[in-house]
């Protein structure tokens, strides 16, 4: 018999003997695997701290189903990133700031006459230039203070509107547009003054462009009586600021500072009037601390008139609401003074 055939028969005999004795098979395979494993190269996983990750390995291998349940995900996130820090909800608003130099809206030291004894032949009309001359131009106006302390968000939307209008109308067209708005507003105030004074009412020709605004406020005028002042300057003697008040009169039996506004868009809510409530509060405080006025005011009224003649929106401010906006005004006034001081230091 050839040597190759002998080797083949010998191998078959060994396999048959092994299969007949199955008890030796695991040992044979284990021994073979052990021998083979000795030939493998060094593995980097041997250096891993297995005790550190023992719990994680046990968790993954202990179950045959997927461990990615909601509870398991929360546990893993907590292990990897730590505990969740809950942010403040939208309803948690910061406490309102209090003015450092708080001055009351009303003047406790001012002796006010009853309304029936404060009637004049003509309403008060103190010119603003005379006040500026008296103060040598060093006292800021309410309008200036509000403009220079305008919130960033409000300034952003105002600038965006301006740029949009410039894109549509051009620089010159936008200038003409704003000039026309100013002219219409001025005509509207002049004719309102005539109507409130009842001078040549119904005989005077209405200026073109203002008839729509006048029609818009007709239902408001029927509730206004006892005009005390028209286009009159006010000066807060303690806080040192100036303003020009459109009107002080009784509205539904409440003495109010009345501010007439024109708008091309509806403004049904007081928040739509932006800083106008602060302006009203500033004027009320100034009147109460101005000796030229022998009365005090604690209410306000914003009237928004529309060019198309649709009924004007009225926003009445009672005493509590006036106090609310008075505090906001005091904060804006403090901000203005702080900015002014910083600017003077840099010069």
Curated annotation (Swiss-Prot):
Membrane-crossing residue ranges in chain numbering: none
Keyword DNA damage: yes
EC number: 3.1.-.-
Keywords of this entry: DNA damage, DNA repair, Exonuclease, Hydrolase, Mitochondrion, Nuclease
Alphabetized GO MF terms: single-stranded DNA exodeoxyribonuclease activity
Major location category of this protein: mitochondrion
GO biological process: mitochondrial DNA repair
Residue numbers annotated as active site: 246, 259, 261
Compartments reported by the entry: Mitochondrion
Cellular component terms per the entry's GO annotation: mitochondrion
Anything else known: This protein may be expected to contain an N-terminal transit peptide but none has been predicted.
Function summary: Single-stranded DNA (ssDNA) metal-dependent exonuclease involved in mitochondrial genome maintenance. Has preference for 5'-3' exonuclease activity. Necessary for maintenance of proper 7S DNA levels. Probably involved in mitochondrial DNA (mtDNA) repair. Specifically binds 5-hydroxymethylcytosine (5hmC)-containing DNA in stem cells.
Family statement drawn from the similarity comment of this UniProt entry: Belongs to the MGME1 family.
Protein's UniProt name: Mitochondrial genome maintenance exonuclease 1
Species annotation: Xenopus tropicalis (Western clawed frog)
Gene symbol of the encoding locus: mgme1
């Amino acid at each position: 018999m050839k040597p190759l055939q002998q080797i083949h028969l010998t191998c078959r005999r060994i396999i048959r003997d092994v299969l007949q004795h199955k008890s030796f098979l695991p040992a044979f395979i284990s021994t073979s695997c052990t021998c083979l494993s000795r030939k493998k190269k060094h593995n980097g996983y041997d250096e891993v701290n297995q005790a550190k990750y023992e719990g994680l390995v046990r968790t993954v291998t202990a179950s045959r189903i997927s461990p990615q349940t909601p509870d398991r995900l929360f546990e893993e996130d907590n292990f990897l990133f730590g505990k969740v820090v809950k942010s403040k909800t939208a309803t948690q608003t910061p406490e309102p700031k209090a003015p450092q130099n708080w001055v009351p809206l009303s003047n406790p030291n001012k002796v006010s006459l009853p309304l029936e004894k404060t009637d004049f032949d003509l309403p008060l009309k103190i010119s603003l230039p005379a006040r500026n001359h008296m103060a040598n131009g060093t006292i800021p106006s309410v309008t200036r203070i509000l403009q220079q302390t305008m919130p960033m968000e409000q300034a952003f939307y105002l600038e965006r509107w301006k740029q949009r209008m410039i894109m549509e109308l051009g620089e010159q067209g936008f200038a003409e547009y704003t000039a026309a708005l100013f002219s219409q507003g001025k005509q509207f105030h002049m004719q309102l003054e005539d109507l409130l004074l009842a001078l040549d009412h119904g005989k005077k020709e209405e200026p073109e462009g203002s008839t729509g605004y006048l029609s818009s406020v007709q239902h408001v005028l029927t509730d206004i009586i006892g005009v005390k002042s028209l286009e009159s300057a006010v000066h807060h003697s303690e806080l040192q600021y100036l303003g020009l008040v459109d009107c002080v009169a009784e509205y539904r039996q409440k003495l109010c500072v009345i501010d007439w506004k024109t708008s091309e868009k509806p403004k049904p809510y007081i928040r739509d009037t932006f800083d106008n409530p602060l302006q009203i509060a500033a004027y009320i405080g100034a009147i109460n601390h101005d000796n030229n006025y022998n009365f005090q005011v604690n209410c306000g009224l914003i009237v928004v008139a529309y060019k198309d003649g649709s009924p004007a929106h009225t926003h009445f401010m009672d005493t509590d609401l006036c106090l609310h906006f008075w505090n906001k005004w005091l904060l804006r006034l403090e901000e203005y003074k702080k900015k002014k001081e910083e600017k003077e230091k840099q010069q």
